Amino acid sequence: MHIPVMLNEVIKSIKIIPNGTYIDATFGCGGHSRCILSKLNEKGKLIVIDRDPKSIEFACSIKDRRLIPIHGNFSKILKYSIKYKIFGKVQGILFDLGLSFSQIKDSNRGFSFMHDGPLDMRMNNLHGISAKEWINNANIKDISFVIKEFGEEKFYKKISNVICKYRKIKNINTTKELVNLINKACGYFYKKKHPARRSFQAIRIYINNELQELKLALNDIIKIISPKGRIVFISFHSLEDRIIKKFIINNSRKKIYPYKLPILESKIKNDNIYKLKYFKKIQPSKKEILYNKKSRSAILRFAEKLKYD
Ligand SMILES: C[S@@+](CC[C@H](N)C(=O)[O-])C[C@H]1O[C@@H](n2cnc3c(N)ncnc32)[C@H](O)[C@@H]1O
């Protein structure tokens, strides 16, 4: 069963107004959405986005006229906000990044190094290239780069060498085959954590273009929310958290102009219109980690849009 991560903290930080408009940009199994809906009155609205067709199929099965499901990438959030006439009127947006419970546990999706299945790893398995296609065709430099950069894996050279040697003889088709190769390359060095953890994370991030998706969404979200609106992020690894932290910090500062440069007051106001108030990061409690081990690496960051006046 999917347990939404830091549910109480999300609800508190997104600060629900009962007749407000909210976006859950990562619907998943709908854990957070269900709770947000329960806090809205009949005038409230919840737009939910997910790139996974199964997740949105599930959202569509929920009969609630306040809920608007969108199958697509959250990098298109600006386009969706215009289409649904909520641009500048959203009181809160939630990004709960990473994979949902149903994606991880379904061995046919190929996300898990714990279960054998086809090496796919696409969140939207109707589009794009699968991990299998990529790993059997990419050059060694690209494989090394992905495992090093997106997995922060120090044995990236060993792993990519073993992969490229093996595929000269036979294609890598399954998660188990890939896990065995990674074990062969560096299993000896990993005593506590699974040797394939970082490489699987890296390949998944690459296949789904996850960091770029996040950066594109960040370009637009401040414009979409209303003054006093909140943006809440839950991330599960340092690459995403760094991007989020940088985004919040950069947008929390007022623009500073060179001394004595003649600038119109209207320009200063305009430049400072989309600013954020930054709150302290939150991590799951010991109690939560005990009953939901998957929450242990989660970091929640949130910010509020201020209006210059
Ligand atoms: C951790 S799960 C969300 C779980 C959800 N909060 C819940 O409580 O059930 C993340 C979801 O985000 C989706 N997702 C990840 N990146 C996305 C993107 N760029 N655009 C749209 N959906 C995305 C995944 O398909 C997955 O279903």
UniProtKB/Swiss-Prot annotation:
One example GO MF annotation: rRNA (cytosine-N4-)-methyltransferase activity
InterPro entries named among the record's database cross-references: RsmH (IPR002903), SAM-dep_MeTrfase_MraW_recog (IPR023397), SAM-dependent_MTases_sf (IPR029063)
Primary localization: cytoplasm
CC per GO annotation: cytoplasm
Keywords per UniProt: Cytoplasm, Methyltransferase, rRNA processing, S-adenosyl-L-methionine, Transferase
Catalyses which reaction(s): cytidine(1402) in 16S rRNA + S-adenosyl-L-methionine = N(4)-methylcytidine(1402) in 16S rRNA + S-adenosyl-L-homocysteine + H(+)
Keyword Transmembrane helix: no
Subcellular location as annotated: Cytoplasm
Protein's UniProt keywords contain S-adenosyl-L-methionine: yes
Annotated positions binding S-adenosyl-L-methionine: 30-32, 50, 74, 96, 103
Organism superkingdom: Bacteria
The protein's Enzyme Commission number: 2.1.1.199
BP GO terms, sorted: rRNA base methylation
Protein purpose: Specifically methylates the N4 position of cytidine in position 1402 (C1402) of 16S rRNA.
Membership in a protein family: Belongs to the methyltransferase superfamily. RsmH family.
Name of the molecule in the record: Ribosomal RNA small subunit methyltransferase H
Lineage: Bacteria, Pseudomonadati, Pseudomonadota, Gammaproteobacteria, Enterobacterales
